[in-house]
Amino acid sequence: MPEGHTIHRIARDHGRLLVGRSVAVTSPQGRFASDAALVDGLVLDRIEPYGKHLFYEWSNGLVGHVHLGLFGKFRVHLGDVPPAPIGMVRMRLSTDVATIDLAGANTCAIGTRDDRDAIVARLGPDPLRRDAKPALAVDRMVRSKQPMGALLLDQSVISGVGNVYRAEALFVHGIHPSRPGNACTRDELEQLWVTITAMLRRGVKDNRIVTVDRRLVPVPKGKLRRGEATYVYHRDLCLRCGTPIQTVELGGRPCYFCPHCQPT
């Protein structure tokens, strides 16, 4: 599932092609057809990312909601002539400069601002947003008996963090993923927020996940293989000390950690 940096990057890149323009909204697959008709031909005012969610604000006040889930994917085609759809395209957004197709998304719907606000109200602060309130996430973690590896995947605690960033951020701070939130100090959790924010921002800039310190670890250009730009995630050995990496199941996903650098 795409992590928060991908969603913010999509909002930025797609916004340049769609925002401020009249957009033809269709559903080649048909599942989104009735919703598409509500905004077809209208001007798109804004694309707002929040955690792993995308919200499309239309000129008539309606708001589109997309959550990619595990299998959702966008395809961007530049030019003023829309190509033939490839596969099961749920939503197609076409302007005079580009066509953007969405397939396989967990959620693709048109609603109201109240619908959008209700979704956001269930989410924790998003480190990539200017209006984020870190204290809310820190308060929830420091009072919780849940393990840190589960808390960081809980989108009601902190929004946008996925399996890679949780493992890497916990490693940087030497926190074992099974340590309860209330066994961490407030200062530890505040610094963890800072690290997560920096990692996510770098992800938006690079359009890929690189968590290692580039000053110490050379990162190859182009497409990365798993483990080439991480300390513990999807690695056999810890990048720092060489200890075999272990995993623990938390939040329904395996969390990678180094038993030497992240003692219990």
Where are these regions (language model features)?
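Structured catalytic/nucleic-acid-binding cores of DNA maintenance enzymes
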Residues: 1-264
